[in-house]
């Protein structure tokens, strides 16, 4: 509610008509009297340029407020670790709105009464004030005539008749409510476009005591204004006209200062925005989630699939998907696996969201990828152990049983288990079988993470595993026989995309749950089961089943990235920010806890603990977002280099690399690094250049990795900083070859000597990531 005008010519305070004196007495600092004497100043000058000379009344409620330490608006810049200083714009919370010459000053909305007696809206209380005197607009009452008011707008005076209409205090029973509402709508529309509709000054009727002038701020919340008005509602009756906008601005500044302590570098706008974003993100977690049976698996029929398949079976010994670009190779292999669904459609429609089933009319579609015969050969030739390489399982009468022995697994023992209707799982076939190694290794370039495999041999009329979900995305390739599958979608957002596999469910657990897919997967077919989908299968009573599961995405999520980034960020912020190293507040144990107790210092919980923690978290978030996202990508890439399968090389690649092929150790055919020697990386993602500091770097690569998951320590090789430009040229040129002359003479490497460039090339070759082709 606006403040009442207490000027000597402005009427009484109880809003009842009185007789106007012929000439009001002039008091000290009477600004309305100065108009009469010809000494009038604009409203912006008189109310905002000159402070009051009379003592101001301060309400006791204001005196009881805690004093602020600072207002938080003097922050010149924000300093963060691991990056340059970022200058701030000083904030916008109390920025005065300036009116340019091209912008017309806002006209006040006032009460008016038309000739037909219909009242318009109540007077608007907030106006935009220009710093320019010529654009000021104000009203004053004629001292000799209490029934007239003079409007002064840009130096032009207009005398109009006064009709007193009070805010929310007078109801005109003669006014028709429908006409009043219609008039409001019309004036609202007119007020929205001031350029189209001009206010008729002759119809403007207003009482000066109903006018309140205030500065319009861009970012002051309505809630803060309501608090100001409620706080000074009682003050209005005793306060004179000098309680103006300068005092209101001071009160508003104090309220903002209460939410800050001694953090002059903190921007409250940023933290407020982050809170809103966080709440919106939390609210959107469940948005769009489709539970359980409402999801639909997409099934591609045999008739549709038959038109896309080549008649000739694939020979995995011949590296069928190879291209000079390893990323293209990966895309070809993945396209073969999910065909006839194209790669982009799969990632748009199915990846980590829906089941995809592909039925094919070609039983030999997967060629010589894997077979029961090949499994027997691996058992005979390799030392495969229980638990590490082989699991024996049986699911009977709703109970899953593991029947693993100890030591090496022999073919004859496996045969006995199969005869007893047990399922045999080969945990890591890529370690022993080159064909599965080839498929998994090249798919790593597609997914950017470790890709592994399992094989499951299950005799006819049996089942080896109870219903469960896995922590990986699974592509099940049916290479022999057939299997009957049931797949259930997650029933809540909490079950979506788990990072750990589930335990075994019973048949009772699955009762009442409708699967999204239930049916046979035949030889040559494929089914994709997203992470977190519960599944269970059984074989035909007359036919055994052998399928290869290609798995990806294990522990490769945003959560895993955050687990790496946050500790690094906390360490970096702790080094830079001494306030993060301060001790916890005294009496913290008595401020709060999970259990609802009568904590003696609970009133200090927000001020001493919560606000401080929120401030540190805001700085932590800014540090991660502004300076650690790039390094987080490097961290995950380094993790990939440690876990990933090594590349499987063709004979030609072996011959051109440091590995060699049928190398004559006593021969004279040495690899020569001359001007016409051509070089390129073996794969796009076999190596990664990482920065340890501004002038120190190293390379992490997977050339020497074990085919057993993390079977060897990661390989890290120091790399000279003078070779960074050479590395960059090779990276940008991939998959094309570049001669040494092209590398040495290009603009990117001109800052390095020829010796430094050659040294970088030789280091890359010696660590095994470079292919070299000598001129003939």
From Swiss-Prot:
Keywords annotated in UniProt: Chromatin regulator, Dioxygenase, Iron, Metal-binding, Nucleus, Oxidoreductase, Repressor, Transcription, Transcription regulation
Residues that bind Fe cation: 468, 470, 535
JmjC domain sequence ranges: 425-569
Cofactor remark: Binds 1 Fe(2+) ion per subunit.
Catalyses which reaction(s): N(6),N(6)-dimethyl-L-lysyl(36)-[histone H3] + 2 2-oxoglutarate + 2 O2 = L-lysyl(36)-[histone H3] + 2 formaldehyde + 2 succinate + 2 CO2
Comp. bias (Acidic residues): 166-204, 217-288
Main location: nucleus
Sequence segments annotated as region (Disordered): 1-57, 87-126, 165-288
Obligatory cofactor(s): Fe(2+)
A biological process term (GO) from this entry: response to osmotic stress
Gene3D superfamilies referenced in this protein's UniProt entry, alphabetically: 3.90.930.40, Cupin (2.60.120.650), JmjC domain-containing ribosomal oxygenase (ROX), dimer domain (1.10.10.1500)
EC number: 1.14.11.-, 1.14.11.27
GO CC, one annotated term: nucleus
Record-level Gene Ontology MF annotations: 2-oxoglutarate-dependent dioxygenase activity; histone H3K36 demethylase activity; histone H3K36me/H3K36me2 demethylase activity; histone H3K4 demethylase activity; histone H3K4me/H3K4me2/H3K4me3 demethylase activity; iron ion binding
Annotated compartments: Nucleus
Domain of life: Eukaryota
Compositional bias annotation for Basic and acidic residues: 47-57, 98-119, 206-216
Classification via InterPro entries: JmjC_dom, NO66-like, RIOX1/NO66-like_C_WH
Record-linked Pfam families: JmjC_2 (PF08007), RIOX1_C_WH (PF21233)
Protein role: Oxygenase that can act as both a histone lysine demethylase and a ribosomal histidine hydroxylase. Specifically demethylates 'Lys-4' (H3K4me) and 'Lys-36' (H3K36me) of histone H3, thereby playing a central role in histone code.
Record family assignment: Belongs to the ROX family. NO66 subfamily.
Protein name, per record: Bifunctional lysine-specific demethylase and histidyl-hydroxylase NO66
Species: Caenorhabditis briggsae
Gene it is expressed from: jmjc-1
């Amino acid at each position: 509610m606006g403040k009442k005008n207490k000027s000597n010519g402005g009427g009484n305070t109880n809003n009842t008509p009185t007789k106007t004196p012929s000439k009001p007495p002039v008091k000290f600092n009477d600004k309305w009297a100065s108009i009469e004497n010809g000494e009038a100043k604009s409203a912006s000058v008189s109310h905002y340029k000159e402070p009051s000379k009379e003592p101001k009344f301060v309400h006791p409620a204001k005196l009881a407020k805690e004093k602020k330490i600072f207002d938080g608006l003097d922050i010149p810049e924000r300093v963060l670790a691991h990056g340059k200083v970022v200058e701030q714009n000083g904030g916008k919370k109390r920025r005065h709105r300036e009116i340019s010459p091209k912008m017309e000053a806002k006209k006040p909305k006032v009460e008016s009464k038309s000739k037909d007696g219909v009242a318009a809206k109540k007077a608007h209380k907030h106006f935009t004030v220009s710093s320019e005197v010529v654009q000021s607009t104000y009203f004053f009452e004629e001292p000799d005539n209490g029934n007239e008011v003079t409007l002064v707008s840009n130096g032009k005076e207009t005398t109009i008749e006064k009709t007193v209409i009070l805010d929310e205090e007078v109801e005109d029973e003669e006014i028709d409510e429908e006409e009043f509402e219609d008039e409001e709508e019309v004036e609202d529309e007119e007020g929205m476009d001031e350029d189209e509709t001009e206010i008729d000054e002759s119809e403007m009727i207003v009482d000066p005591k109903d006018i309140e002038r205030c500065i319009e701020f861009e970012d002051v919340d309505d809630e803060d204004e309501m608090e100001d008005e409620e706080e000074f509602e009682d003050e209005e009756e005793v306060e004179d006209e000098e309680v103006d906008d300068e005092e209101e601005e001071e009160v508003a500044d104090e309220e903002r200062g209460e939410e800050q302590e001694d953090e002059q570098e903190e921007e409250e706008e940023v933290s407020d925005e982050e809170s809103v974003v966080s709440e919106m993100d939390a609210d959107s977690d469940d948005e769009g989630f489709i539970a359980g049976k409402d999801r639909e698996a997409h099934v591609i029929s045999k008739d549709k699939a038959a038109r896309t398949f080549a008649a000739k079976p694939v020979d995995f010994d011949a590296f069928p998907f190879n291209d000079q670009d390893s990323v293209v190779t990966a895309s070809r292999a993945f396209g073969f696996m999910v065909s006839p669904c194209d790669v982009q459609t799969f990632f748009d429609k199915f990846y980590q969201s829906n089941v995809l089933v592909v039925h094919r009319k070609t039983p030999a579609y997967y060629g010589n990828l894997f077979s029961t015969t090949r499994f027997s050969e691996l058992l005979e030739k390799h030392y495969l152990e229980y638990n590490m390489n082989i699991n024996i399982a049986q699911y009977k009468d709703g109970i899953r049983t593991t029947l693993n022995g100890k030591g090496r697994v022999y073919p004859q023992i496996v045969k006995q288990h199969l005869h007893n209707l047990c399922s045999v799982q080969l945990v890591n076939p890529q370690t022993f079988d080159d064909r599965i190694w080839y498929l998994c290794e090249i798919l790593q370039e597609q997914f950017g993470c470790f890709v592994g495999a399992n094989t499951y041999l299950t005799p006819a009329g049996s089942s080896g595993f109870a219903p469960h979900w896995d922590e990986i995305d699974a592509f099940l390739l049916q290479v022999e026989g057939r299997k009957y599958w049931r797949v259930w979608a997650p029933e809540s957002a909490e079950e979506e995309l788990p990072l750990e596999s589930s335990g075994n469910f019973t048949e009772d657990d699955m009762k009442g749950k409708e699967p999204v897919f239930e049916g046979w997967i035949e030889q040559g077919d494929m089914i994709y089961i997203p992470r977190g989908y519960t599944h269970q299968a059984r074989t035909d009573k007359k036919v055994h089943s052998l399928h290869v599961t290609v798995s990806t995405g294990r522990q490769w999520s945003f959560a895993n990235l955050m687990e790496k980034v946050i500790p690094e960020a906390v360490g970096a912020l702790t080094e830079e920010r001494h306030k993060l190293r301060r001790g916890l507040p005294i009496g913290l144990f008595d401020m709060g806890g999970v259990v609802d107790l009568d904590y003696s210092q609970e009133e200090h919980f927000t001020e001493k603990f919560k606000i401080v923690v929120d401030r540190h978290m805001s700085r932590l978030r800014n540090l991660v977002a502004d300076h650690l996202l790039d390094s987080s990508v490097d961290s995950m890439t380094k993790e990939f280099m440690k876990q990933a399968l090594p590349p499987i090389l063709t004979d030609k690649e072996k011959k051109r690399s440091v590995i060699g092929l049928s190398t004559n150790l006593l021969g004279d055919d040495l690899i020569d690094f001359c001007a016409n020697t051509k070089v390129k990386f073996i794969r796009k993602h076999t190596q990664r250049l990482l920065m340890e500091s501004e002038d120190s770097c190293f390379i992490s690569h997977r050339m020497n990795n074990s085919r057993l998951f993390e079977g060897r320590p990661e390989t890290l090789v120091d790399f000279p900083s003078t070779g960074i430009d050479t590395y960059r040229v090779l990276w940008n040129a991939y998959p094309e070859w570049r001669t040494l002359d092209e590398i040495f003479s290009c603009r990117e490497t001109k800052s390095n000597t020829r010796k430094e460039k050659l040294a970088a090339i030789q280091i890359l070759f010696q660590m095994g990531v470079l292919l070299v082709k000598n001129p003939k």
